[in-house]
Amino acid sequence: TSQPLLKNIEPFQDKVTIHYGDMTDGSSIHKAIKSCNPDEIYNFAGMSQVWQSYKSPLTTMDINCVGLIRIIESVLSLELDCKIYQATSSECFGKVMETPQTEKTPFYPRSPYGVSKLYGHWITKNYRESYGMYACSGILFNHESERRGAEFVTRKITIAVAKIKHGLQDVLELGNLDAKRDWG
């Protein structure tokens, strides 16, 4: 779990049991999976900001790529009949060759983050085909929530607008105005 984001589940904490695991530590992942003996695993863990992947490409690969292998290998070594879902990203498409993207659109990732998510997509398929596991990936596009971090553009805008309305801020400051995102 991501420690700073635990506040996002405060309303539900009495209804869930949290099993801690560090995606960079195979033994903690193995221990967490063994302790809860899951029927299903949904891997939403990972470095999720493209700009961070340029500053920390090795950490991005360790968490997003090797971390996934740690999950899958733990399931295999524990001989669990467990379904695995890998959250992948539209960043796998990178420089898109067509709009909208489909299952037939070529992948062309343009960042360490995009490459790491494409790795997750393909390694999930590889394990499914090699071991007959129930393992699948979903390519997620932008998704918004009040729980999303303030560093993301939509939250940056909505938070600033609220502050401006209440006289707590005068201007909305944004970064790269040439950046493009598909919110389709």
Task: List the model feature ranges, each with a label.
Residues T1-H143:
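N-terminal Rossmann-like NAD(P)+-binding domain of SDR-like oxidoreductases, especially those catalyzing
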Residues K7, M97-P100, W122-W183:
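NAD(P)-dependent short-chain dehydrogenase/reductase
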